[in-house]
Amino acid sequence: MGRHKKIKPKSFSSPKGTHDILPQDQKYWERLRHVSKNIFSYYNFLRIDTPHFEETGLFLQAVGAQTDIVEKQMYSFSTEGGDELTLRPEGTASIVRAYLENGFVAEPHPVKFYYTGSFFRHESPQRGRFREFNQIGLEVIGDENAVVDAEIIHVFSVFLRELGIPEFYFHVNSVGCSDCRPQYRSLLLQYYRPKAKGLCRDCKRRLKHNPMRLLDCKEEKCRIFKKNAPQLLDNLCEACKKHFTSLLEFLDEAGIPYILNPYLVRGLDYYTRTVFEIFTDSDLGGELEIEKEKEIVLEKVPEKTEEAEKPMVEGEVAAEVKIEEKPKVLKGIALGSGGRYDNLVSLLGGREEPAVGGALGMERLVTLMKSLGLKVPGESKQRVYFVQLGDMGKKKSFKIFEELRKNGIAVGESLGRDSVKSQLKLADKSGSDISLILGQKEAIDDTIIIREMSSGIQEVIPQSKMIEILKKKLKR
């Protein structure tokens, strides 16, 4: 009778586009959460958490049925009970749903939220881009003033500086509103239709359903057409022009670095007026190429003219937006993005309520922090190691640990080992300054051995004096 060949169990790895956050990296993630909480709370943003999955219809209605996210990137599934659900691909739709469902409409406005969490998109994984990814986000609902757009950008700037990131800048643009976009859409169609044969397959579809998304295509053969495409900034209505000019004045006053990118659009249909992206020039493997840098110039209205002598109407902008082109190639990696979404609340069943928000990618921030060699406060250095011998030593160990914890003394241990020699080797390897040794005799006598690792000198002390003596030795 032949011997049966043993079948090797199948091994597993993390799903494509996902990653483990390992113990040695946790300090970076804790740093992001800690700094974001402190800064966002200071600016009166309230923490909110929403489910990782929502009704599929929420994203169809909010994000837009013709967007790449809805058509290609959502993880959707049906339950046995017949529910159609989707893992959240972005945060804003869920925040607005929670705002409406939980009665925030009755609260004093604006309502300001911040959040952190995981999101999911079926994209092609690459460095800095995952299918499960984490974001830190801000949302403000209930204020149309451009100063709120500037506040979102300002708070993100403060956050990045607090992390120690030295260089970053914002790309900003206005995508207008329902009053000025139809005319611009017609101009785009006039420009792109004769070039339809040269477009990629996705852009041929966008030409029919969502022409503005043509400006966001990453295919090189489509990008070359963008150079001479009409600019929305030239076709903004007066209200949108004033709003955008006001935003730029706020950014100038705050000293926030920005570049006007008149071809910047976002991949979500709900955006109106302000849109922005945040970049760093640090080499993290990502690359953004802009054919021409657009320099914004705010030309003040001359002081002494008949027009200037007329009293200004409240809200009137005393500046003209002028765009100058300078050939330049910029390389960088996107850290985050955002914009205004004045129609989304009503689109999801609420009253007309202006809103603005944005989000930063946490994976990219962690990668950047590592690349820059930023010092991140970690856990307190372990300077004490606990060595036990016998069952009595093990049983008494938890009381010892708790006493050390209450006094802020970090301790290492290996309770599963019985050999004192092997435990002392681990203590030495860990870099601990002191070992506490608890054997059978010490456990019975309520004493403990304190050993200095550098000299090997040790003494027996009462457990009641352990904390006092430890603190004195650790101060040396």
Language-model features and meaning:
Residues G2-R476:
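TRNA-recognition modules of translation machinery and tRNA-sensing kinases, especially anticodon-binding
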